[in-house]
C-alpha cells in the first residue's frame, strides 16, 4: 500500500530520501529542478501547456478551474497582501510547498491540496493564498500527470515532463561528486532552476544566455557569478543536466 514516502510511477516506484548538507549536489540531499527546452519536432501548443489564473480567496476549500488542462506545477502569489511566492508540483506531491523568494526548505503545510483535470484545489481557513479578501494569481504548467523514473544520468531522477512544450520537473538526490541528471526532455534545456528541498539553500539558476560556467540566484539580486561546482562548466545535453 502507498505511504507518504512511497510513490507509484508510470514505470516503477520511488522511495523519497533527504539529507542536511547545502548545495545543489550534496551527498544525501533531495532536490527538485525545473528544466525548460523545446522539442523542434513537436510544435508546442501554449493553450494546452501554460495558463495563468486569477482567483479570490474564500477561507473555505476552493477549487480553481478553467485552465483547460491538469497542471503539474502551480506557482501562486497573493497580490494584495504580503505573502510569499508558493510553488507546488506533482513530483513532490500536494501540501509540499517551496517558496521561491526565500532559502527555506520544503514545508508540508501548504495550501494546495491537489491537482485535477482542469485546475487545482486549495485548503480553507488558516492557509495563506485562500483567505477572504485576498486576490491571488496562479501560474500553471502542464507536464505529465504520472512521474517517471529516469536513468539517463549518473544519478537516477524522478521526472514529470512535457516534451512538446519543453518543460519538466525533476527530483534527484545529490551525491557530492560530479554527476549528470536526466531531465526527460527531447532537447537541451536553455533554463534550469534548482532548489534544495531538504534544507536551507539559495535557488540556483543556469541559463544558456548567461553561460554554463556561471549561475544566478533566483531569490537574490546578485549578478551572475562564476563557479565550476554548479554546472561542472558543462552545457546541458538532450538528455541530462550536469552538476559540479
Language model regions located:
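Surface-exposed molecular-recognition determinants
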Residues: 1-244
Amino acid at each position: 500500500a502507498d505511504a507518504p514516502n512511497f510513490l507509484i510511477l508510470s514505470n516503477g516506484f520511488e522511495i523519497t530520501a533527504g539529507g542536511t548538507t547545502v548545495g545543489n549536489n550534496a551527498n544525501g540531499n533531495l532536490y527538485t529542478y525545473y528544466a525548460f527546452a523545446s522539442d523542434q519536432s513537436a510544435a508546442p501548443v501554449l493553450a494546452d501547456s501554460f495558463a495563468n489564473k486569477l482567483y479570490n480567496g474564500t477561507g473555505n476549500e476552493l477549487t480553481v478551474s478553467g485552465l483547460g488542462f491538469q497542471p503539474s506545477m502551480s506557482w501562486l502569489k497573493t497580490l494584495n497582501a504580503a505573502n510569499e511566492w508558493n510553488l507546488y508540483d506533482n513530483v513532490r506531491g500536494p501540501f509540499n510547498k517551496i517558496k521561491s523568494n526565500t532559502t527555506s526548505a520544503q514545508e508540508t503545510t501548504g495550501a494546495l491540496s491537489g491537482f485535477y483535470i482542469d485546475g487545482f484545489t486549495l485548503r480553507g481557513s488558516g492557509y495563506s493564498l485562500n483567505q477572504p479578501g485576498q486576490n491571488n494569481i496562479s501560474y500553471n504548467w502542464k507536464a505529465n500527470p504520472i512521474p517517471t523514473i529516469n536513468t539517463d544520468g549518473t544519478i537516477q531522477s524522478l521526472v514529470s515532463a512535457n516534451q512538446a512544450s519543453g518543460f519538466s520537473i525533476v527530483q534527484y538526490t545529490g551525491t557530492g561528486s560530479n554527476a549528470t541528471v536526466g531531465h526527460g526532455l527531447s532537447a537541451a534545456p536553455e533554463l534550469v532552476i534548482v532548489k534544495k528541498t531538504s534544507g536551507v539553500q539559495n535557488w540556483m539558476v543556469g541559463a544558456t544566455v548567461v553561460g554554463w560556467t556561471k549561475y544566478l540566484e533566483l531569490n537574490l539580486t546578485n549578478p551572475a557569478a562564476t563557479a565550476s561546482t554548479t554546472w561542472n562548466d558543462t552545457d546541458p545535453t538532450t538528455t541530462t543536466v550536469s552538476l559540479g
